[in-house]
Structures are given as structure tokens and as C-alpha cells.
Amino acid sequence: MNLKKALRKKKKQVRELEGYRDKLIEYDNHLDTLGERNSYSKTDPGATFMRMKEDAMKNGQTKPGYNLQIGTENQFITDFRLFPNPTDTLTLIPFFHSFQYRYNRLPNICVADSGYGSEENYRFMQENGIEAFIKYNYFHKEQRPRYTPNPFHAESLHYNAQEDYYVCPMGQHMNRIGTKRDKTASGYITESARYKAKRCEGCPLRGSCFKARGNRIIEVNHRLNQYKRQARERLLSEEGIKHRGRRCIEPEAVFGQMKYNMTYRRFRHVGEDKVTMDFAFFAIAFNIKKMCAKLIKEGKGFITVAKYMFMGLFITRYNWNIATCCQMHEEKAA
């Protein structure tokens, strides 16, 4: 009797181990599909859950999607690429590699918003001879008429570059005590110098300067500050003002045409390869349509314009048929 109980117990343990084995294989497959991302969609493993700009419920709901990056020139789409990560900071350098693969060269000038302003991106563009007109995170705040810098922030303290020390608001020297290294999500190593004050106890400005215990310690990334100074000089120059003015009517106008005038708000296929093909067709049709409008404005011949219009209408109609079918299926499902 005891032998039968022991045998049943062993069989039960074997079944449990087999179930654990199957689950372990399933979890390994999920991790392989996930890669370096934090999430993925079951219906489209290539898509990542992101917070979209169109949030009807205003609750930060995440939806599966792709981060589409485009390059434009005179409102023509020159290049595009899809990324699984929601932040724009990590997309600039891979986008440059995609541009180089397509055109066998890198662009001479890059104009972008503050979402791309990181030390890694600034350094890449400087080393590759790209003139960067890219804002950093608080550039717009500095340009406000009533902006006054906080005298207690590390950026506002006087720095002696020869002897490598800072001077606090009370005139005390803050000597360097070491270097802090951090690794970004892309693997880039940033270095920040650490400076410490000697006697903060009893200082009348301590309540406004900092509230932690002990003496104040600041961390300064000198390389990033140098890149920001160079970016500020470029952005405030005459050429920089011209590029900043065109920034609003270049990629933003293209996205506005796509979403609102051409109702292209969602991809109609599943999988990164098919989604790339989807947008490639759209980009071709968009550029042809733009070229037709430009030729008509310049007074070109009817036959030349008709050729471009026929090609654009064919591709746009193909995409429109797909969109109509998808909409019908969604209505039936609802």
C-alpha cells in the first residue's frame, strides 16, 4: 500500500516537472521575442506598448505601436525608419546609419527638437562633421523674457577651469572629489565630475542652497555642458534662427498632412516588415503628390504632371482600399 502511494506521488511530481518545463520554454520564448524591450503585443510581436498622443480618456493608456521617425527636406520625405522604443533620444544615431545606408553619406545639417539633445547624439554629430541645430531640454525656458537662472543651481556657480573647482554662493571653494560614471540604455558611458563643499554647517544660505545632511555635493557633466554651449551659439545665430523657423513647417507639416488631410493615422498591417512596406508605399505616394503640386505651381506641362498624378493616385488608391477594408472589418467586429 505504501509502495502504491509512493509511486503515485512520484508520478505527480513528474507531471508537475513536465508542466514547469513547458512553462519555462514558454517564458524563454517570450523573453526572446521581448528582446531589450519592456513589452510587446500578442497580436503584433514587433509592436511595443507606448503612450500615444491621441489619448481620449486622458489617463495615459498604453497601446501597441511603432515609433516612426522621418527625415524631411522641403516637406518631402527623404528617409524613414520604425523603432520599438518610445523615446526619441535613442533613435537619432540608428536613423543616421539608415540614412547613410540609403544615400551612402551622412547629412551635413541636422535640425531636431529637444527630445534628441543628449551627450551621445551631440558627440556623434561632432565626430562625423554634422552641424547640429538641436535644442537641449531647457533651451526654450532660457529664451523667455522673464527667465532668471537660479543662483544656487550648479550651472549658475562660478567655475575655475584652471584649478578645477567651483565657488558656492557664499564664496566657498568646492573641490573635486571624484568622477561618477553612468551607462545609458544604449550602452554609452557618461562621466560626471563630483565637487564637495568643506563647511556648510551654519551657512545662512543653506536652506536655499540645499536641504540634505552634511556638506553639499554637486555633479557636473563638463562634456555635455560644452555641447550645450555650442548648441546655444548655433541656435541663437542667424542661421540657427532660420532653421528653427523652418523646423515647425518641415516634419510637423508632413505629419499634419498624413494624419488629418490624408487620414493616415494607423498602420494597416502586422509585423515590422509589413508595416515598413505599408509606410514606404505611403511615402512614395506622398512625395509624388507633393511633386505634382510643385510642378503645377511652376507651370509645367500637362503630360509631365499627369504621369506623376497617375502614379500617385494608383498608390494612394491602393492604400485607401486597404484602409476601407480594415474599417469595414472593425465595424463588423464592433
Language-model features: locations:
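Anion-binding and metal-coordination hotspots
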Residues: 1-334
